[in-house]
């Protein structure tokens, strides 16, 4: 297995949100999060207009879930900030 270009890390809040998902959905969402380590700017990624350095990608069954993350190119790091349903994920973004 070849090493991935970027390292994935999660905020404590993002980990809690991921753990709260149904097991089936969590597996689907996590497998798509893992792909961000290979390409943090995949097709369909969008930069959030209101927050500097934050991106979002649609994931999971029906693409109804969002992963909000920061890309730190200088450290080759993807920091997952929020994970959740598209209706809830943008609340309380700091």
Predicted regions located by residue number:
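Short amphipathic alpha-helical/adjacent loop interface patches that line ligand
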Residues: 18, 22, 33, 52
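Enriched for short, Lys/Arg-rich terminal
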Residues: 1-7, 12, 16, 20, ...
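A short, surface-exposed loop/turn module that caps and links secondary-structure elements
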Residues: 34-60
């Amino acid at each position: 297995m070849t090493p991935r270009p970027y390292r994935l890390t999660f905020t404590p809040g993002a980990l809690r949100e991921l753990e709260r998902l149904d097991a089936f959905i969590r597996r689907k969402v996590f497998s798509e999060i893992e792909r961000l380590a290979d390409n943090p700017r995949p097709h369909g990624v969008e930069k959030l207009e209101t927050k500097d350095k934050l991106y979002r990608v649609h994931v999971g069954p029906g693409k109804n879930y969002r992963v909000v993350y920061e890309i730190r190119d200088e450290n080759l790091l993807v920091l997952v900030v929020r994970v959740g349903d598209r209706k809830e994920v943008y609340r309380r973004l700091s």
